[in-house]
């Protein structure tokens, strides 16, 4: 399937592989076949970039991979929410204009820029709410939505954040196993 639209993938060549990030400890993750078979694509240079940004922000790489899996199925060009949510991390541009400006991001369809905005936002939510579980709820619902629809009703654990957290643990184990090989 990847070969039918080769031009679509040139976006991964828009960034120099020399971003000065700390790659120590990086292990290539092989996305599950169910995703690659349906158009998911997470090439090594994108993974290395994501890993470096995660290290820079102090956010778990396995968490971000699990979040990308849940949000977009590794489809860097996915558009959701009636055309509002874009890319790997399904960023809602209207909600992140200030963040995009601060990060010099102009194009959420660019996977590198998309992941940078997503990790920056996730990092902020983890810092604000103190747990990955609550940060994921706020990522999914928006902060006001999480407060009104979940937390006000005593809901802290639900399908979205539990799926991501269990996948995070599985991905962590897979990466540790691959690092040991």
Where are these regions (language model features)?
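Gram-positive cell-envelope targeting signals
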Residues: 1-2
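Short acidic-hydrophobic catalytic motif
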Residues: 5-17
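Catalytic glycan-binding domains that act on GlcNAc-containing polysaccharides
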Residues: 15-181
């Amino acid at each position: 399937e990847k070969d039918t639209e080769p031009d679509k993938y040139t976006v991964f060549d828009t960034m120099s592989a020399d971003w000065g990030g700390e790659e120590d400890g990086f292990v290539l993750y092989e996305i599950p076949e169910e995703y690659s078979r349906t158009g998911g694509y997470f090439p090594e240079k994108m993974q290395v970039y994501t890993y470096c940004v995660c290290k820079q922000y102090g956010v778990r790489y396995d968490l971000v991979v699990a979040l990308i899996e849940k949000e977009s199925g590794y489809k860097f060009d996915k558009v959701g929410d009636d055309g509002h949510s874009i890319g790997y991390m399904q960023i809602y541009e209207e909600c992140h204009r200030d963040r995009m400006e601060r990060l010099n991001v102009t194009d959420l369809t660019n996977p590198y820029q998309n992941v940078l905005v997503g990790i920056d936002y996730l990092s902020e939510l983890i810092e604000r709410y103190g747990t990955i579980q609550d940060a994921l709820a706020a990522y999914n619902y928006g902060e006001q939505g999480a407060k009104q629809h979940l937390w006000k009703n005593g809901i802290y654990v639900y399908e979205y954040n539990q799926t991501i957290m269990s996948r995070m643990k599985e991905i962590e184990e897979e990466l540790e196993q691959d690092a040991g090989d």
